[in-house]
């Protein structure tokens, strides 16, 4: 898998901001087939930082229903919590 296709987009949420400030971690939505090693190499190549560790969370797709009828599905996704080396930073929305 190519590194450009692994990182889909950064997660911008309250929890992701707290984790970034407290533990020097950044959170990304990643390709469902990507593993920890590929994610670490993609982040290092894309942002020129050193990665200390990667934790991965998979969310299953869920059935959406209205009035007892199943009308569709909410797609599943995969998130990666990437821990950066001390002194390294990835700035997405600093100063906004």
From Swiss-Prot:
Species of the source: Solidesulfovibrio magneticus (strain ATCC 700980 / DSM 13731 / RS-1) (Desulfovibrio magneticus)
Keywords: Ribonucleoprotein, Ribosomal protein, RNA-binding, rRNA-binding
Presence of keyword rRNA-binding: yes
Entry-linked InterPro entries: Nucleotide-bd_a/b_plait_sf (IPR012677), Ribosomal_uL23-like (IPR013025), Ribosomal_uL23/eL15/eS24_sf (IPR012678), Ribosomal_uL23_CS (IPR001014)
GO molecular function: rRNA binding; structural constituent of ribosome
Residues annotated as signal peptide: none
Subunit structure: Part of the 50S ribosomal subunit. Contacts protein L29, and trigger factor when it is bound to the ribosome.
A cellular component annotation (GO) from this entry: ribosome
A Pfam family reported for this protein in Swiss-Prot or TrEMBL: Ribosomal_L23
One BP annotation, GO: translation
Family of this protein: Belongs to the universal ribosomal protein uL23 family.
Main function: One of the early assembly proteins it binds 23S rRNA. One of the proteins that surrounds the polypeptide exit tunnel on the outside of the ribosome. Forms the main docking site for trigger factor binding to the ribosome.
UniProt name for this protein: Large ribosomal subunit protein uL23
